Amino acid sequence: FRLEDSVKLSEIEKKVEEGALSSFLKPPLYSKKQTALTFGKFDGVHIGHRKIFSTLFAKAEEYGLQSAVLSFTLDKDSFFLRERKESLALPDEHFTRLKNAGFQEVFLYSLTESLARMSPEDFVRSILHEALKVKQLVVGTDCSFGYKGEGDVALLKRLQKKYDFTLTVVEKLYTEGEDGQSVPISSSYIRKLLEE
């Protein structure tokens, strides 16, 4: 423990008022056990996310792995990219929803500048492989990560052998839009409906 790592009571009270106490209580980005993991913002935890989660839980059970999720928040202390969209849930609500979804480990982190500038392969190597010991990785088809979101499913497919994990890609779910057309279920679509 270092003095510069300490937090003032007034800062904690302010975080409680903002519904962001979990930003002080987050666990270290490290897992003692090998994991079946998914990562992403998972804003609102909708039915599309739940399809990813159920696939992950099945993989965790099949291979005897710890089920884990790495998610990110864009609170006002975060480094964020040009387009900041309002979140569907406060950080504490988000953490609770993920924990209640059934994950054994929930890692919820602010999107810092260093994380946002990390190359996609560095993210896979240092975070997924070294820190979180990922053996089974489950993502959606539109997965993006690393600097400018340059990492994608194609890159994960190329890196899975090098970093000793198996990738499972879950297809999107669709619903009928207002015009009768098929629309992918996403946090952006839900946010749009809430704005109307």
Residues covered by each model-derived region:
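Nucleotidyltransferase catalytic core that binds NTPs
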Residues: F1-E196
